[in-house]
């Protein structure tokens, strides 16, 4: 038998037994698997806070890990290379601890309004976040079609006496202040009317009839509109505060997610898929209007309303 050929009995100074070959193969395989694990990179997001069609295209070695809420994403951020957070939750992070993301060419494809959240609202500096989706806050009503007849009142409907104790407000006081302006009396009245300031649980409170109205980012409601005729959405004509979905990198020198994947959400066919699910990338309004022609008209008008709204 030639040197290097496996023998059955393990004898022979320069030969490898079949058992040795199997052990060596197992050890080599374990090493390869460990190497794969070390090369894996995670994107953390809370459930319902990322477009599933886009996340499904995340290339290897990246993988998506879904958590229950944004607080868990923040708590586990040291374990991940990429985070998905709204601008409200991202504001708790130190921008200096975040690595730049994307490119100037990629950011230039977005509407200019997206540049500020891309810098985490700093007046200048590098792009610290990829603002891949934007959603206005909307008024969501359950079985209150009587209030829809007064939609011209806009956000003043929140102060309707019939909603006292039946209203869910955003967790962020900043949003409530934006809705009521600078009037402290109106803001105090709004807070007294709220059953909770907890938008993560607002839909559950609506569906279980513990609330009749809630202020939520538009995207959270779009899937529900298709299956629950009791739910109606009001986007006041005088506008609304915006909620931005952001991707952020940790401060360690992790590899950046592929630019092709970041850009995919801005282009057909994926762009139309995410629009159907209620996600609206912050592209120029004319381009969004053109793509939205592939949607049912009521959904298109909700997602891409006239530019002055």
Question: Where does each model-flagged region fall?
Answer:
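Ligand-binding pocket segment of bilobal, Venus flytrap-like solute-binding proteins
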Residues: 76, 87-93, 168-239
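A bilobed periplasmic-binding-protein/Venus flytrap-type ligand-binding module shared by bacterial periplasmic
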Residues: 138-146, 242-258, 273-274
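Extracellular/periplasmic juxtamembrane helices and adjacent flexible linkers that interface
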Residues: 256, 260, 264-309
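N-terminal secretory signal peptides and thylakoid transit peptides that target proteins
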Residues: 4-29
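Non-transmembrane alpha-helical segments in soluble domains
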Residues: 22, 156-159, 203, 207, ...
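Short beta-strand->loop
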Residues: 101-110, 129, 226-241, 250-251
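N-terminal segment of the mature folded domain
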Residues: 37-152, 159
């Amino acid at each position: 038998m030639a040197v290097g050929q496996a023998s059955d009995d393990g004898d022979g100074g320069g030969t490898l037994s079949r058992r040795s070959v199997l052990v060596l193969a197992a050890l080599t395989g374990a090493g390869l698997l460990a190497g794969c694990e070390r090369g894996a990179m995670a994107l953390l997001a809370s459930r319902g806070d990322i477009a599933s069609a886009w996340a499904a295209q995340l290339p290897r070695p990246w993988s998506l890990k879904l958590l229950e809420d944004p607080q868990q994403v923040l708590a586990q951020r040291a374990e991940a290379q990429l985070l998905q957070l709204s601008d409200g939750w991202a504001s708790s992070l130190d921008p200096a601890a975040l690595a730049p993301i994307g490119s100037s060419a990629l950011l230039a494809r977005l509407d200019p309004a997206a540049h500020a959240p891309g810098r985490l609202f700093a007046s200048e500096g590098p792009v610290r976040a990829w603002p891949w989706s934007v959603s206005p806050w909307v008024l969501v009503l359950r079985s209150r079609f009587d209030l829809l007849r007064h939609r011209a009142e806009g956000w003043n409907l929140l102060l309707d006496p019939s909603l006292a104790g039946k209203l869910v407000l955003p967790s962020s006081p900043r949003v409530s202040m934006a809705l009521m302006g600078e009037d402290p009396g109106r803001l105090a009245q709004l807070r007294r009317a709220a059953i909770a300031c907890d938008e993560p649980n607002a839909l559950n409170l609506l569906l279980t009839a513990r609330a009749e109205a809630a202020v939520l980012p538009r995207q959270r409601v779009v899937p529900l509109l298709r299956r629950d005729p009791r739910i109606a959405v009001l986007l006041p004509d005088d506008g609304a505060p915006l909620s931005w979905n952001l991707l952020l990198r940790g401060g360690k020198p992790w590899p950046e997610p592929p630019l092709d994947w970041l850009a995919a959400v801005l282009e057909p066919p994926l762009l139309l898929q995410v629009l159907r699910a209620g996600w609206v990338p912050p592209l120029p309004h004319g381009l969004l209007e053109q793509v939205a022609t592939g949607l049912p008209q009521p959904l298109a008008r909700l997602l891409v309303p006239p530019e002055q709204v």
